[in-house]
Amino acid sequence: MLFCATLSVAQTNYYTTSKTFYENGYTYRCDLCASRFLDLYNVNNKWIGQFPSYKSTGETFVMPDAGIQLTTHASWLENKEKVKNIVNAAFTAAQKQTIANQDITLTMYINTDTGKIDDVCFTFLNNEPYAYIPVSVYRNIELAIKENVQEVLTDEGRKLNFIYWWTSVVPK
């Protein structure tokens, strides 16, 4: 007779409700929608819930259908790769295996005076594997992006108070 035993490790879904995480030196907020999508972000973020506007008039910026280039294409391509590498490096091999080809969406808020990233917001479903990743991992991603990513802005981009930049990444 052959006996087979499996080890089952309990996992914690950290993001089952809207709540605030008081961590070691930082605070994160999880806002959960009825759709089960959630936004996870540092409470010190200044642009969450705001819309980009023109510095000179305060008028809300709306991207036209034809598009307007707000950053240079070269810097966007370079920084997209940097963000992908930062996200890839943040997760352990076991976490990547659990995530298994599912993407995570990052919304970054670009400072139009410096080109640096001011704020980062993570969006995912609260029943996806990302919901089992502790806040500290997302904090490390936020800090690495803020330290290593800087966009080259166009003249049009510099007219705004900030620029949205979102991307989806599948950790490999």
Whereabouts are the PLM-identified features?
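Charge-biased low-complexity segments
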Residues: 11-172
